[in-house]
Regions:
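Positively charged, solvent-exposed patches that mediate nucleic-acid binding
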Residues: 1-145
Length: 145
């Protein structure tokens, strides 16, 4: 019985390690130059209740030292509250993307994304934002096929 408990604990620890390893393997990289933003904002977009996603297919898949890189930027308009509110919205959106990556859900790494958050992300619960993000990334993956 003690051996079974130890085995279960060991399996739980291994699962946690693997989830963290998967998250570490995919690095979120933000866009840095305004030319990149302008180019992507002229491409395709999808509107959702909590955000708008602009996306463009990368010309080449980016890998650095066996780490996969997801090019994604979270942007807020200055009209939305103060800096504290805008940063909280960005954190919520970023954690939703990280959770999607942890659960091996469909985020296509061959795309570059710019996500414009909306004000209602601040008020609503994380699970609603996560569900909406998951649905939008599924739609993008289906559009790619």
């Amino acid at each position: 019985m003690v051996e079974n408990l130890l085995l279960e604990e060991e399996q739980k620890e291994e699962k946690k390690y693997l989830l963290n390893y998967i998250l570490i393997m995919i690095k979120l990289k933000s866009l840095s130059k305004s030319k990149q933003f302008i180019r992507i904002l002229k491409k395709k977009k999808l509107n959702a209740k909590y955000f708008t996603i602009y996306f463009e297919k990368n010309l080449s898949s980016v890998k650095k030292d066996d780490k996969k890189i997801l090019n994604i930027s979270f942007v807020m308009k200055k009209k939305i509250g103060n800096a504290v509110i805008r940063n909280r919205i960005k954190r919520k959106l970023k954690s939703a993307v990280q959770k999607i990556l942890k659960e091996k859900q469909p985020i296509d790494l061959n795309y570059t994304y710019v996500i414009f958050g909306r004000n209602n992300v601040y008020k609503d619960k994380f699970q609603l934002v996560f569900g909406e993000a998951n649905d939008m990334f599924k739609r993008i993956k289906q559009m790619a096929k």
